[in-house]
A protein has these predicted regions:
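Active-site entrance/lid segments in N-terminal catalytic domains of soluble metabolic enzymes
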Residues: 2-5, 12-31, 36, 56-58, ...
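N-terminal amphipathic alpha-helix/helix-capping segment at the start of soluble metabolic enzymes
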Residues: 33-53
Length: 294
């Protein structure tokens, strides 16, 4: 298996789906697709038909993987994290395999191994594909799923041109070349759905998750979240690393489950966000979100 990922042109991607589904009823190898029941849950002014979805990880970097996850029943997509370091520079820093789970799981992956512009294109391709596939194949409501951005890992990088352009493009894809390309391809392949395709919303994402590396200080986390809430007006999640549980709790839990041979020290537990700092920080952030109507 190649260590490098190669995005598939959108027309080729859609022809693959159409041919495979017509031939054997599969969608990228998913034999039995989930068909929504009509029920849905509210989130950020949108609806999701199931409360499940792939977290931001290597599995969600390419459009075809997002489509496959949707076919299997996922409806909330936290797409892979982007940051100022990307592409070959990032890939060179990630040990292989980046996730090893023969027994316990070891995770050394980081953010997207594509370039940030490539990542945005993949997510917009997946968004447009799912809008049409959900309707044409009857998988569910075209408005029954949500894309959630993930960004890291410092405010300077997030405000920089590369990541800022990504955020703006995900919030409004109407001026991106890939959004126009996707709509033209879809109208060619599904001419009976032209009016629906023309009406596909360019608002790919209205929410964001703040991903924090080990050691990101609480004040930096709060600055990032505050910026995304007040300046970008995005519904905002903040990921807390498992280290917030404390070293003793983590050690005791693993030991009780038979994983006493796994070795780790207290360094990250001491350097990461502490519970005592997290609680008042989230209270302040919630108050800020309330004041911004989020």
């Amino acid at each position: 298996m190649s260590e490098k990922m190669y995005p598939i042109p959108f027309k080729s991607l859609m022809n693959w789906v159409i041919t495979e589904y017509a031939g054997c009823g599969d969608v990228f190898g998913v034999h039995k697709q989930y068909h929504a029941t009509g029920k849905s849950l509210p989130i950020f002014g949108e609806r999701i038909e199931t409360p499940f979805g792939p977290a931001a990880g290597p599995n969600g970097q390419l459009a075809q993987n997002i489509i496959a996850a949707y076919a299997a029943g996922a409806r909330f997509f936290e797409v892979k994290t982007v940051q100022k370091m990307d592409g070959a520079d990032l890939a060179a820093c990630v040990p292989r395999p980046c996730i090893l789970a023969n027994d316990e799981g070891y995770n050394q992956e980081w953010s997207t191994e594509l370039t940030v512009p490539q990542a945005m294109d993949e997510y917009i391709k997946a968004w447009c594909a799912l809008k049409v596939l959900s309707k044409v194949y009857g998988f569910g409501d075209p408005d029954g799923f949500v894309f959630n951005m993930s960004v890291g890992y410092d405010l300077e990088g997030i405000k920089g041109e590369k990541v800022n352009t990504y955020i703006d493009g995900m919030m409004d894809a109407s001026r991106t070349a890939i959004f126009g390309e996707c709509k033209e391809v879809l109208k060619e392949l599904f001419p009976q759905e032209t009016a629906f395709i023309d009406a596909i919303s360019p608002r790919v994402s209205r929410s964001v998750t703040v991903s924090t590396l080990h050691g990101c200080p609480p004040d930096e986390i709060e600055r990032i979240a505050s910026y995304l809430i007040s300046e970008k007006h995005l519904h905002t999640f903040v990921k807390c690393n498992p280290t917030i549980l404390g070293y003793q709790t983590a050690r005791r839990t693993l030991d009780s489950m038979g994983y006493d041979y796994i070795v780790f020290d207290e360094h990250h537990f001491n350097e990461d966000l502490q519970w005592a700092d997290a609680v008042p920080m989230f209270e302040r952030l919630q108050a800020l979100a309330d004041s911004c109507g989020l």
